[in-house]
Amino acid sequence: MRSPNEQARRISEGKKDDGNMIFVQSDDRKADEAKSLRDRAETILGNKLASMDIAKLACEKWLDVRAFGQLFALKSNKKAGKKKDDGSDDEGDTGVSIGIRGPVTVQSAFSVETIDITSTQITKSVSGEGDGTKRGSDTMGMKHRVDRGVYVFYGSMNPQLAERTGFTDTDADAIKKVLPKLFENDESSARPAGSMEVLKVIWWKHNCKPGQYSSAKVHQTLRDSLKPDGIYTLSNLSGLVPEEISGF
């Protein structure tokens, strides 16, 4: 299983590469000098950080905020006077905690069939004692990998929440554009370059705000036909034919 947070992170990183401003950035790929989320918020929003308009301003500035939402729980640098039970003055932190619900939701990715996990013992060869001519083999731990698996994850966009955050059709197209490239420039020792790829992106677009069908019914048209090797045959719903996009 792949977590929805991991999928959202990859989508956000891809949108940042397209020139969009992103609030939550990984340290190794950040596009500014901010040392923390608070630092980034203060740099962009300045003295408006404690304003009740922070949600609107944040959505205007950062694509990932108006898409996936964000919780701003930031302490103030200032102290506010408070009264103790005995009436004496006491200083306490003040701050802001504002939650923004984003219109884009991403589900966890599950393998189409049961996967086999290969476990490998990791050892190191070191000179423990003496003159260094003798080496001992020490176990460092275990490394687990999936040799092959086909995963699928589903998502949706809520028009009502999109109106609140200012999420537009242009933003939706930005997400659609980056999905086929989800694993590009995201390699690591656990995911070497070329070891993972997006096979297909199935993109449904309703012709009305409430939706022509429920999300569950739409997703079921793919779920019912998906084979272990990734082959599928869509049973399209009346009046709702998706766009099928090949991976990068």
Q: Which ranges hold each PLM region?
A:
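RNA-binding basic/glycine-rich loop and surface signature characteristic of RAMP-family CRISPR effectors
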Residues: 1-248
